[in-house]
Amino acid sequence: MLDKIVIANRGEIALRILRACKELGIKTVAVHSSADRDLKHVLLADETVCIGPAPSVKSYLNIPAIISAAEITGAVAIHPGYGFLSENANFAEQVERSGFIFIGPKAETIRLMGDKVSAIAAMKKAGVPCVPGSDGPLGDDMDKNRAIAKRIGYPVIIKASGGGGGRGMRVVRGDAELAQSISMTRAEAKAAFSNDMVYMEKYLENPRHVEIQVLADGQGNAIYLAERDCSMQRRHQKVVEEAPAPGITPELRRYIGERCAKACVDIGYRGAGTFEFLFENGEFYFIEMNTRIQVEHPVTEMITGVDLIKEQLRIAAGQPLSIKQEEVHVRGHAVECRINAEDPNTFLPSPGKITRFHAPGGFGVRWESHIYAGYTVPPYYDSMIGKLICYGENRDVAIARMKNALQELIIDGIKTNVDLQIRIMNDENFQHGGTNIHYLEKKLGLQEK
């Protein structure tokens, strides 16, 4: 097993990684910015290293500082968590080149799956169903581009190859706006991702977001751990996640899961990963793969009993998968609500000092967070301050537990989205299950005209 690792992240995921390390007897090094010296995992870690000032660019995105921290503390591996450098192939490469283990896939795998065009090509080759599209980047010949759009059928969506998180995409409903949409997406992509390659896909009007969790050891073994539904979104950011996804039959789960596991073996995948799909009219369409642990991983842990972070650590230590596919069983249902420090009306971040705090509890309730009374939420980072996960023997029980837990949760001193989460849990259509990715924005009156 790994002797000592650097946790190259902050907030709740850093604490989650620290807990898994402690259970496995792994020593921990918490790297932090000057604004984060009071974070819970920093206070609990075996060693701490301040890697720079508050802005992420100078701390959590500062590759030389993170690698130096590993060197001076004698760590053997670096866990990137999610966000920040977790899907940065150059970081993974530099970590390995410096003699450390990157807890995640190989750099070339991150590169392959990070570029949407090469990722789609690899998935098609592996037999994973994809959205009908341009099968490669779009050129400058508008006659050819119009022909592609005609073959796919309007509406289509123009996407940046290096994009993600809802950035660098445009819906086109007819020939008249095609040329302008392509050039605008190109310009945006060049500015945001330094890569102006764009491609075209069929635009699905009312899909759900369903994703498959996978684990692969890079030694020819890969398993899928059922699916999650993350359709409750605002501005392409997930708000509520659940597992399993309502209405997905065991046959459908096996069909798509086996293809994802096979794809992992085909591309030599190592670690935890997630295949994201749009799901419409009983069909799955691959959109992207996240080559890291995800925010919503706890709902999968609750229904399968598999500790995904511990599995990541074991795989990084060179161990084969500790579970076989036939040992993965789905039991019950889990729902996760992301708790954000934000104004419930404007959705603007609401940093500040937490004056009073009480975490919910009870059977089937899990609270993943780094906050405490007296903790100051800094203005420099993502607004998520916690995740509330509730488990039940079925979906109705999980939702009922979540309603109670949300009402028990007290966070005073800052504004949060707890009331919004209560509204979602009480929403009839959500309770029925199967709402699409546009539902929450329509409910909030935010749908762009």
From Swiss-Prot:
Cofactor mode of binding and number, as noted: Binds 2 magnesium or manganese ions per subunit.
Top-level EC class: ligase
Gene Ontology biological-process entries: fatty acid biosynthetic process; malonyl-CoA biosynthetic process; negative regulation of fatty acid biosynthetic process
Assigned GO CC terms: acetyl-CoA carboxylase complex; cytoplasm; cytosol
Binding site for biotin: R338
Domain called ATP-grasp: residue spans: 120-317
Residues involved in ATP binding: K116, K159, G165, G166, E201, K202, Y203, L204, H209, H236, E276, E288
Binding positions for Mg(2+) 2 per the UniProt entry: E288, N290
Reactions mediated catalytically: N(6)-biotinyl-L-lysyl-[protein] + hydrogencarbonate + ATP = N(6)-carboxybiotinyl-L-lysyl-[protein] + ADP + phosphate + H(+)
Reported effect, E23R: Loss of homodimerization. No effect on ATP binding
InterPro entries (alphabetical): ACC_Biotin_Carboxylase (IPR051602), Acetyl_CoA_COase_biotin_COase (IPR004549), ATP-grasp (IPR011761), ATP_grasp_subdomain_1 (IPR013815), BC-like_N (IPR005481), Biotin_carboxylation_dom (IPR011764), Biotin_COase_C (IPR005482), CbamoylP_synth_lsu-like_ATP-bd (IPR005479)
Binding site for Mn(2+) 1: E276, E288
Effect of R19E: Loss of homodimerization. No effect on ATP binding
PANTHER family for the chain: BIOTIN CARBOXYLASE, CHLOROPLASTIC, PYRUVATE CARBOXYLASE SUBUNIT A
Self-association state and partner proteins as the record states: Acetyl-CoA carboxylase is a heterohexamer of biotin carboxyl carrier protein, biotin carboxylase and the two subunits of carboxyl transferase in a 2:2 complex.
UniProt xrefs under NCBIfam families: accC, PRK08591.1
Function, in words: This protein is a component of the acetyl coenzyme A carboxylase complex; first, biotin carboxylase catalyzes the carboxylation of the carrier protein and then the transcarboxylase transfers the carboxyl group to form malonyl-CoA.
Protein name, as recorded: Biotin carboxylase
Species this chain originates from: Escherichia coli (strain K12)
